[in-house]
């Protein structure tokens, strides 16, 4: 009977899906009209229950009767937290994941907005594990990645044998899924739990709603922390604002040191602009940099503005304040302006507040505003789904899903939706990129 159930499932599931998700699938127990299936890990269990529930249920009922039921379990793999002692073997330096060598403490502009964060990370680089974990959060483009990688680069400079693992949460998730698919999950865990001396996870907010990846990170976190190794988590929001995250994971983030990078002042932004031009070996007049620091409110945008001005000067051989103003006012407004303007427009049209739109509320008008706003930001403002996720405080996958839903409705000729988009386009008064609707 067990073989019959497996054979029937194999007939109904495509070869690719079978090879991806069912190679480790077997029946652990068959009693009366109840089947207990077993798979290799929690992630596959979660995937099968969501995507293949109807097929599995139908096969079980067809063979065992209409009252038959099933459940899926997974093999519990013990999580090792013990650090074994043994002879130290001098090995060639190993960088587990790449770092940008340009991110150093020396070229980081320090002001009142990031002084506390800078001092914490400098101390942590000299004494890893003293502040553990460190949870670093701030708005977009304020230097979280620079600070985190500066710590990693400092450690490698002072100890070339230090094994630093820096990656975004999305990279962690994708690597985990790939390891599961290819049967290399043990190697994946070995890499991050035992080989890494320091683990830096950037953009943790992109794991919102992805429970399987959160579970894997939870056990990785515990293993590294219990071994006394440094953990750094970077986010665009506080731990409490990580909605749809395991509470046990949030408690781990809160057990350490919470560090915030504040919004930089105009003076801070001017210093950052000067530093960027110095690093590019290009002299830009102070009046131009002052102008840039007034119209842009974060270091990333200032960096982009200076690159545009450098490109112009290299091409035409001249640059002054008048030219700079013309160049920078003829390009798109910075994402912060996009964010504020778009949320204001949506809140006005759908009779709700900007906070409602970025919240987890699911009332019809708020959900509709959020969905349409995401589509408009991706398709009309040409923002990446990652940036849109940051604006709306939602996961990357949620943005992709909402955009696809709107595309589907538009293809079906939804007149109401088209009218809403036209209204948003009209109210935006040209701040959107691309053609008008």
UniProtKB/Swiss-Prot annotation:
What is the UniProt domain comment for this protein? Answer: Domain I is involved in oligomerization and binding regulators, domain II is flexibile and of varying length in different bacteria, domain III forms the AAA+ region, while domain IV binds dsDNA.
Q: State the organism named in the record.
A: Thermosipho melanesiensis (strain DSM 12029 / CIP 104789 / BI429)
Protein name as it appears in the record: Chromosomal replication initiator protein DnaA
One GO process term, biological-process aspect: DNA replication initiation
Q: Name one GO molecular function term.
A: ATP binding
Family statement: Belongs to the DnaA family.
The protein's gene is named dnaA
Reply yes or no: does the keyword DNA-binding apply.
Answer: yes
Using the UniProt annotation, give all residue ranges assigned to the region (Domain I, interacts with DnaA modulators).
1-67
Cystine pairs: none
Locate the region Domain II: 67-97
Identify the SUPFAM superfamilies for this entry. Answer: P-loop containing nucleoside triphosphate hydrolases, TrpR-like
- Could you tell me which residues belong to the region Domain IV, binds dsDNA? 314-437
Q: Which GO terms describe its cellular component?
A: cytoplasm; plasma membrane
Q: Which CDD domains match?
A: AAA, Bac_DnaA_C
């Amino acid at each position: 009977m067990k073989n019959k159930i497996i054979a029937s499932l194999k007939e109904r599931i495509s070869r690719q899906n079978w090879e991806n998700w069912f190679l480790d699938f077997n029946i652990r127990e068959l009693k009366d009209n109840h089947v207990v299936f077993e798979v290799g890990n929690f992630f596959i269990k979660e995937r099968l229950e969501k995507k293949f529930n109807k097929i599995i249920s139908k096969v079980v009922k067809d063979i065992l009767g209409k009252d038959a039921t099933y459940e899926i379990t997974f093999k519990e793999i013990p999580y090792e937290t013990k650090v074994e002692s043994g002879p130290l073997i001098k090995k060639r330096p190993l960088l587990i994941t790449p770092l940008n060598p340009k991110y150093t403490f020396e070229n980081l502009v320090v002001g009142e907005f990031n002084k506390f964060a800078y001092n914490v990370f400098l101390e942590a680089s000299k004494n890893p594990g003293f502040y553990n974990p460190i949870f670093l959060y701030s708005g977009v483009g304020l230097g979280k990645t620079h600070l985190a990688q500066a710590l990693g680069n400092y450690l490698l400079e002072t100890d070339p044998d230090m094994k630093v693992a820096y990656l975004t949460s999305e990279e962690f998730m994708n690597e985990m899924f790939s390891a599961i698919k290819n049967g290399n999950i043990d190697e994946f865990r070995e890499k991050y739990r035992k080989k890494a001396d320091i683990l830096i996870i950037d953009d943790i907010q992109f794991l919102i709603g992805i429970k399987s990846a959160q579970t894997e990170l939870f056990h990785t976190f515990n293993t590294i922390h219990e071994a006394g190794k440094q953990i750094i988590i970077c986010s665009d929001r506080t731990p409490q604002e990580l909605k749809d995250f395991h509470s046990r994971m949030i408690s781990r983030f809160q057990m350490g040191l919470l560090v915030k990078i504040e919004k930089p002042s105009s003076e801070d932004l001017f210093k950052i602009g000067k530093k960027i031009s110095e690093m590019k070996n290009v002299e830009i007049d102070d009046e131009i940099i002052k102008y840039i620091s007034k119209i842009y409110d974060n270091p990333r945008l200032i960096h982009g503005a200076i690159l545009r001005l450098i490109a112009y000067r290299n091409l035409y051989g001249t640059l002054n304040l008048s030219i700079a103003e013309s160049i920078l006012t003829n390009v798109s407004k910075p994402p912060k302006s996009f964010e504020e303007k778009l949320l204001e427009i949506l809140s006005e049209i759908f009779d709700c507040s900007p906070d409602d739109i970025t919240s987890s509320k699911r009332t019809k008008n708020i959900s509709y505003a959020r969905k349409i706003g995401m589509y408009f930001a991706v398709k009309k403002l040409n923002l990446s789904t990652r940036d849109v996720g940051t604006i709306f405080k939602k996961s990357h996958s949620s943005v992709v899903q909402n955009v696809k839903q709107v595309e589907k409705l538009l293809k079906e000729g939804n007149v109401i939706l088209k009218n809403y988009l036209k209204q948003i386009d009209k109210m935006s008064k040209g701040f959107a990129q691309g053609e008008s609707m």
